[in-house]
A protein has these predicted regions:
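Conserved non-catalytic scaffold segment of RNase H-like nuclease domains
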Residues: 1-79, 124
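Active-site-proximal helix-loop-helix substrate-binding element of RNase H-like nuclease domains
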Residues: 24-26, 30-32, 36-39, 43-46, ...
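Non-catalytic, surface-exposed connector residues within folded enzymatic/regulatory domains
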Residues: 49, 99-102
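Acidic, Mg2+-coordinating catalytic module of metal-dependent nucleases/exonucleases
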Residues: 72-78, 83-84, 119-157
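Substrate-recognition/cap helix-loop segment adjacent to the acidic, metal-dependent catalytic center
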Residues: 79-100
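Active-site catalytic microenvironments for nucleophilic, acid-base chemistry
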Residues: 88-92, 111, 147-151
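Substrate-binding/catalytic groove segments of enzymes
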Residues: 92-96, 114-121, 152
Length: 157
């Protein structure tokens, strides 16, 4: 099993200048070479990443410094991304600053369009390429969210 080695976050606001990049070292000796290859890192590089507790503490602190109120976890693939962020926060920190809920971008866009099948059409609003670099991917998602907001969906930011 491969737990995600890297993750990125961005505060959704017009400048998109507040970003976070976390790289966690493995927590298991088991790993999948094909899955790790997507990250662009070798197993040897992955072993040099920071301890998960340190990364998650830094991420929590970054959220506290950059987000007003409780942060909202919004993702392209919420079911995948949420499970491990939630686990890491609870296991290493004892709580998750996002609480117990999140939003999937495709569902937000489907609601705006009133079309269940519009769930992947929002991706056309990304300006930053979806490269699987976590910060690039988060920036592209945030760009799309800003456009979706311009199209009329109300957001708390």
């Amino acid at each position: 099993m491969l737990f995600r080695s890297c993750f990125g976050a961005v505060v959704v606001e017009p400048s998109l200048s507040k970003t976070f990049y976390g790289k966690t070292r493995p927590i298991s000796d088991e790993w999948n070479p094909e899955a790790l290859a997507i990250s662009g890192f070798s197993r040897e590089e992955h072993l040099t990443f920071d301890e998960p507790h340190e990364v998650m503490s830094n991420f929590r602190d970054w959220l506290n410094q950059n987000v007003n109120g409780r942060p909202i976890f919004i993702s392209d693939n919420l079911a995948f991304d949420w499970q491990w962020i939630n686990y890491y926060f609870h296991y290493y920190i004892g709580s998750n600053p996002f609480g117990f809920s999140g939003r999937r971008i495709g569902d937000l866009y489907s609601g705006l369009e009133k079309d269940f099948f519009a769930g992947s059409k929002w991706k056309k609003f990304r300006k930053t390429s979806h490269t699987h670099n976590p910060v690039d991917d988060a920036l592209g998602n945030a760009e799309a969210l800003l456009t979706i907001r311009e199209l009329g969906l109300k957001f708390p930011f």
